[in-house]
C-alpha cells in the first residue's frame, strides 16, 4: 500500500475493521484512457515474483472476513461495492453522513495538471522544445476540475453514488478532507481543501 491513501473503519454491523485504499482510476472511459499510466510487464511480474500481489490502479475496499490462525483474512470488494473508480483520489472518509447508522464514503479527488495525459505528451514529443519554453509547455498540461465522490452505504456491502443528490458535486481540484460536527447539531460537515481555490465546508 505504498504511496496510497487509506482509512480503516467497519462498513457493516461487525466488530472487524475493514479498510479502504484509494488510487487513480478514472470513472469515465475518456479520462481513463487519456491518463492511463504505462504498464511495464517486466516490472509487473518482477513485483509479483517478489511476493507482492498484482498491482492495478483502482481503489480497494478490503472486507475483513474472519480470523484464520490468528490472522485476519480480507477480500477486495471494491468493484462489487461500486466504489473502485474515483479518479485521482486523496482523502477517503468513512463516516455516517446521513445518520442512518451505517458508514458512508466521501472521496476527495483532483490533480491540478494531468501529468499522465498521454495525448498531450505524445503531441509535444513531436515538437522541438527549447529550455526556456519548458515552463510554457508545463503550463499547457491539461487541467480538468472534477467533482468529488460521495457514496451512500446501501447496507448490503454496496454503495450508491449520491454526489449530485446530496449537493456535493462541485467541480474543483481537491485533496485533503476531514469531517466534523461543526455546529453541534448531530450532523457531520465535510471540510475539503482545494488547490487554487478556497476550502469548502
Question: Could you say what each language-model-derived stretch is?
Answer:
Residues 1-13:
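Single conserved hydrophobic/aromatic residue that forms the stacking wall/gate
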Residues 5, 54-58, 80-93, 144-146, ...:
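Repeat-based blade/solenoid architectures
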Residues 57-65, 147-153:
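Beta-propeller blade signature
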Residues 19-22, 105-109, 185, 189-194:
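Hydrophobic beta-strand segments that make up the repeating blades of beta-propeller
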Residues 14, 100, 104, 185:
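Acidic carboxylate motifs that coordinate Ca2+ or other divalent cations, activating on Asp/Glu
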Residues 26-53, 111-142:
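Short, conserved, GDST-rich strand-edge loop motifs in beta-rich repeat architectures
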Residues 68-82, 157-168:
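Blade-edge beta-strand/turn elements of extracellular beta-propeller
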